C-alpha cells in the first residue's frame, strides 16, 4: 500500500482530552484562531483569537459574509467534507467574513476509541498590496513593476496565478466557483497592463 494512503495511517493513540490539552498548550496565546470540534460539531476547545473572531456583530444589510450564522453554515459544510475524507485528511479553503478574506485549514484526527475531531486553524488570506515593499524614490523601476500588481483585485490575482501555471479557463472557473467568462474577463486587464508597461520600457 502507498505510504501516503490515509487508510494505512495509524489512528491517534492518545485520548481526545490529551489531544486537546496539547492543542491548548500550543495555541492558548496564539494570534491564530484555532478550535477543535467533535463529529457532532460541538466545540471542545477554542482559543481567545477564535472567540474574538466570531464575536463580531452581524451586519445583515452588508451581505451574507457579515452574518456569523451564514459563515458558520459554510464552514460546517467544509467540516463535513473533511470528516468524509477520513482520518489524516487535511485541506485549506478560503472564505469571506466581515469584508475580509480568510484561509481555513481543517484536519481530521481519529482515535482508537472510535472518536474523531476536526482541528480548525484560520489565517488572514494574503491581500493586496501585492508583494508590498517599502519603496524609496531611488528604485523607480521596481516601484513601477509593483504598481502593475497593486492595481489588481485579489480575485484577478488568483485567476492570473492559475493562468500563468497553464491552467485553462474552464478548470479555473470550476475550482473558483465562477463562470468561464468571468475567468477570461479577469485576465484581460492583466494582459492590458503588462502590454502597456512593456510598450514604455
From Swiss-Prot:
The keyword Iron-sulfur does not apply. It holds the Pfam family PAS. Keywords: Activator, Conjugation, Cytoplasm, Plasmid, Transcription, Transcription regulation. SUPFAM superfamilies: PYP-like sensor domain (PAS domain) (SSF55785). It is found in: Cytoplasm. Its main location: cytoplasm. InterPro entries: PAS-like_dom_sf, PAS_fold, TraJ_R1. GO terms for biological process: regulation of DNA-templated transcription. The keyword Protease does not apply. GO terms for cellular component: cytoplasm. This protein is essential for positively regulating the expression of transfer genes that are involved in the conjugal transfer of DNA between bacterial cells. This is Protein TraJ.
